UniProtKB/Swiss-Prot annotation:
Lineage: Eukaryota, Metazoa, Chordata, Craniata, Vertebrata
Family: Belongs to the somatotropin/prolactin family.
Protein name: Prolactin-1
InterPro entries, per the entry: 4_helix_cytokine-like_core, Somatotropin/Prolactin, Somatotropin_CS
PANTHER family assigned: PROLACTIN, SOMATOTROPIN,PROLACTIN
Natural source organism: Crocodylus novaeguineae (Crocodile)
Amino acid sequence: LPICPSGSVNCQVSLGELFDRAVKLSHYIHFLSSEMFNEFDERYAQGRGFITKAVNGCHNASLTTPEDKEQAQQIHHEDLLNLVLGVLRSWNDPLLHLVTEVQRIKEAPDTILWKAVEIEEQNKRLLEGMEKIIGRVQPGDTGNEVYSRWSGLPSLQLADEDSRLFAFYNLLHCGRRDSHKIDNYLKLLKCRLIHDSNC
């Protein structure tokens, strides 16, 4: 169900409805990201010590994101909206390549591949929805173009299996983390902008 048909001039979906859809989508993406990470972790990461190496190794670490609800509440809604947009945009390339490269993992289960495809598609939808929300909240502003470029493709193609699996592990770990943050930020923004912070 598209948020508004592309090119439609008189899209009458309310801001509240746009936020409802964005929150549902972000929740779904986080659910899928968590499931995919857990499945990969159980199948490929056991006994390899990946978790100790994965700390702070995300490609968009340069985007300063609030760590908790209290920090997020200190940020102006326009900045928080742009931050969500930046994080979503920073995932376009990694998700696209994840779909391709995950097929090359030895005995990769179909469930992991399906989730990678689904997350990539839903991330695009959420990005479109966020651009519409920003267009309503800040008319004329399409959000800043500040987002982190990803340069991790070579690490997903390494010949050394351990190194390659760690690159996947790290990417999925970061995806789960970021999808959780986006889910929380959108709930906070919806509360602030739609319910006047009464939630």
